[in-house]
C-alpha cells in the first residue's frame, strides 16, 4: 500500500519536477557572446541547444571584451575565462587544465573552433583524464544552389577560400587521430560543403564515431506587450533585424534599397548588440528618415520581446548557415524574409528573396503587411519548428548521441 501511495504521488507531481540532468558538458571556444562573430554565436547556439536537451553546460573561453554586455547572457552557461598570460604559457596551462578537469569532471568536452586556442593542451588533459573530446564541425541544412552563385561563397573570395579551406579542414581532422576518445560533432544531420569534406577525411582516417548537435532551443514566449510602448514604436508594422552590424549582414545595402522604394508607414528596426564603425555608417545612411530605428545593447528579454511583437523578422545577409534569429521567429509564429542564401531556403514560414533588389524587397514587404499572409506564414514556420527544431522533437528523433 505504501508503494502505491508513493507511485501515485510521483504520477501526479512528476510533471512539476525539474528535468533530470543528462550530465555535464564543457564547451571550449576562443570567443563567446556577447561578441557577435560566427564562432561565438555558433557556440552560443550549441550551448543553448544542449541546455534545452537537459545537459549542464559550462563554457571555457577567453576574457570577454564587454563582460557587462547583457545581450546574449543566459544563466545556463556559466563561464570560466583563461587570460592570455596563462594560455601563452603551455606548461602552466597544462597544469591548470589538469586541475580544472579534475574539479569540474565533465562527461564530455566539445572543442568549438577553427583556431588552435588551447587545443593541444586540452586534448592532452582530456586524454589523461579519460574524458571524451568532441570536435565540433560545421554543418546545417543547406540548399546547395546557394553556394554556386557569384556573390556567395565559395566564389566570394575564391582564391583565398581555396587556399585556406583544405588545410584548415585537414588540421582540424588531424586532431582526431591523437586520441581514440575523439569524435566529430555536427550541428545538424544535413550536408554542406564543409561537412562533406569532413566526412571524406574522417572516412580515410577510419574515424567511425560522429555525434550530432541539432539547432534547438526553447520557443520564444509571447508575453504581455510592452516593447513597442517602451521604445515609442507606433502602431505601424514593425519589421525587425536582430543581427550585428557588419558587411556580411548588409544592413547598409538594405537601407539604400528601402530608400529606393515607395514603402511608407513601416518601421524597420535594427537590434545591434555593439555600436561599431559599420553601425555609424548605418546611422549616416538613415539620416532623419523616420522609417528606420536602431536600438543598441538591449538585454536578452527585450530582444525576445522585440521579435515576438514584430510583424516580421528579416535578414539581408549573403551567407546564413546558422540563421538563429529566423529560427527564433519561427518558434513563436512570426514570419520572416531573407535572401536565398545558405540554409535559409530550406526553412518555411517566410519569403525567400530570389535576389537583393529594391523591387524584390518592396514586393516582399508589401506582402507581409497583409495580416492574412503573415498569419499563414507564421503558422507554417511554427509547424516546421515544432516538427524539427523544438527540444522535444529533437529528443524524439534521437538526433544527438553523446
Give a label for each model feature.
Residues 26, 221, 232-249, 255-258, ...:
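Conserved donor-binding/catalytic core segment of Leloir-type glycosyltransferases
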Residues 335-338:
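Short hydrophobic beta-strand element within catalytic cores of glycosyltransferases
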